[in-house]
Structure formats: structure tokens, C-alpha cells
Amino acid sequence: MSGPVSGPASGQVTPVLSPGEVAAAVDDDDYRRLLGIPRDAGFPDAVAAGAAAARRWYAVHGRPWIAARRHAVAKIDGDAIVLEDGVRVSGERLAARLARNDAHALVAVAVSAGREVADEAARLWGADRPDESYFLDRFATAVVETLLWRASAILCGEAIDSGEWLVPHLSPGCGGWEIDAQRQLFELVGGIDAAPAADLGEPGATVAVLGPVELLDTGSLRPQHSVLAALGVTRRAIVATPEGACRTCDRPGCRYRRVPRARRVEES
């Protein structure tokens, strides 16, 4: 990845990404976790070739994408964040997290592994090559995680240079933040309404567009290997890690948890 992720409050920034660098950055432990293999087990011989082939495919054909936009926070009003331009961002859990950390700004982020990998996984499935399709689908999911944490790390580094720190990210539909906030967050990154989505086969169905990502009326994103997130910006010195986020996450029965949830922990 090259180039900054953050930028002026009024501007969306999309860094230039190298698919080869992104593919190489996907951690083997995370990839195994998404394949349902114990983290420390290594890749069994039966899956090693397929896993490696998926990584090679993405390094050549993948189109990773990130966009981010920063917004100044005017105040936290109960279960909503009020931005300086008057926009209210709904979400009790997000508002509480930003209030606890005295956040003065919010960064809306969108990441995607790209439409190409979703199309290739679908093509392989349709060609009766389900194993190859599965490996590619899981690798694309690992790419999304990698992009989100990489964006967070770069944003954090830039914030620290300005005497600021990032509050751990939260996504609609996870961690107690309602999925209904998906459209609002999409717009905060820079998404705009588009023409009716004729390919959905539903009269009146529409999509909003943000780079290669589309938001459907249902709140779902296309391609499916995409995610939105919001991060608070504070002048309080805090440290958060992916493992720490998993320890505080209240999502029950998550098969992708990196470490066990702590029995007693103060949520950051």
C-alpha cells in the first residue's frame, strides 16, 4: 500500500494499492482461521496447494480498494453523533464509544477486496470447482480484514503525528451497532445514489455507489467482500490491537474470534 489514507475533512481519499503487496500481507494464521483450520496447525497437505493458488490469483488479478473521509464532531447527543455540518450519525454503541474516549472527529472507512475476486469465485463455483471457489472466497475475506487493519494502522500513525489517537473501529451490524446505519456511513465515506438496479430483478430496487462498492436497499454491500467502518479520533492516548478488540467484542459464538473474550474487561 502506498500513499496516505486520511486527508482534509471535506475530501475522500483513496490510496493506490498493490494487489501483490496486499496478498502477501494476508497473515497465514488469519487465513487458516477463515478456512476453519486451527491457527497453529499449519496448512495440511490437502489444502496447502489450493490456499497458495488463491493467494497467487489475487496477487495478479485482485483489485483491493480503500476509501476514507474524516468528519469533525460537534457533540455527542445521547445515542447519536452530531457532526459539524449538522449530520446526525445514529448508533448508541458508537456514540458511547466515542463519548468515553472524548472523540472530536470521526473517520468513515470503506474497504473492498474488489468485484474481480467475487466474480472469479462465482465462476469457479459454476464450473463445478467448489474447492477452488471456497479457497478464493476465504482469501478475499482475509483481504478485507487485512485492508481494514492496514487502513486503521496508517490512520493511527498519521493521527499520532498530529497528537491524536484512534478509537477502535466499529461496523454496522457488529458490536451492537445497528445495521440500519449502513447507508448513513456509506454516504459519509462519499457514496451517492445511482440508477435503479435492474439486475436485482426487483421493481424499484436501487443501489448507491462508492467506487467499486454498491449499497443495496437491503443494506447489503456488493461485492460481498466489502465492509464499512467508523473510527473515532481523540487526543487521549489509547492503544488498541486486533486481539484486544476480539477480547472486548460481545458477538456471541463468533467462529472467527482471534482470542477468547475476556471475562471482565473495560471496553475501550
Segments the model singles out, each with a brief description of its role:
Residues A103-P172:
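Conserved mixed alpha/beta catalytic, RNA-binding, or beta-rich assembly cores of soluble enzyme
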Residues S2-G3, G7, G11-S133, S268:
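Active-site helix-to-loop segments that bind/position phosphate- or nucleotide-bearing substrates
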Residues R55-Y58, G62, L155, A159, ...:
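Structural signal for hydrophobic packing residues in well-ordered secondary-structure cores
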Residues G173-V265:
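Activity-critical C-terminal alpha-helical subdomain
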Residues A122, E164, V259-A262, E267:
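A generic "cationic amphipathic patch" detector
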Residues V60-A67, L148-W149, I160-W165, R255, ...:
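Intrinsically disordered or highly flexible coil/loop and linker segments, enriched in small
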Residues G42-A46, G50, L136-F139, V143, ...:
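Catalytic cores of large soluble enzymes that bind and process phosphate-bearing ligands
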